[in-house]
Amino acid sequence: MAARHYIIMADIISSRYIKDGDFMGQFKNLTILANERFKSQIVSPLTITLGDEFQGIVNNAKTLFELVFFLEEQRIEAGHMFQLRYSLVHGEIETEINTKIAYEMYGPGLTHAREGLQWAKDSGHHYHVDLKPVPEAQLKLCLELYQSIKSEWKPREYKIVAAFLKHNDYKDLAKMGLYKTRSGAWKKGKSLRIDEYHTVKRLIFLILNHG
């Protein structure tokens, strides 16, 4: 009997145009880090399936978003130039779950997740979400805001952004030598919309908790 599972698929946006020859190694390392970090919450590990695409299955909707945020923040901290597009689906899988590698599984949930990834590609979106009964309209709006904040961060700012995301106190940034004064760090944090970034993440988890 088919059971419903929380599915994540992602691919690299415009991979054919990326000039960094090591981006596939970087992509693979991201999945390795995520599989290690979320070992206890992963049902079937993130597995690269089509060169520039991975899929996996996790235990709940909260983990899906924790995983997305982890991947994005790790990508920024490492200074990777590529961007990822995601499909998050709660759907049926008819075959037995492969807990070792995300291969040899079939079901309408996986089909829908792949179709969602294609929809995101065709429409220019970064996220496709279908997690019924969780209210997806609110999640989609939050993800649009989340993406709008991230899209303003330039690659040359990734080191600074990563420092802001790791350190809550502006004094820590001054100690790291990134800013001479606390006020300078505060102004940069405002321009990067770091507080708004953290707020939209909290809002997503509130929606999930009350969905």
Regions found by a protein language model. Give the residues of each.
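Regulatory and interdomain segments flanking nucleotide-handling catalytic cores
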Residues: 1-211
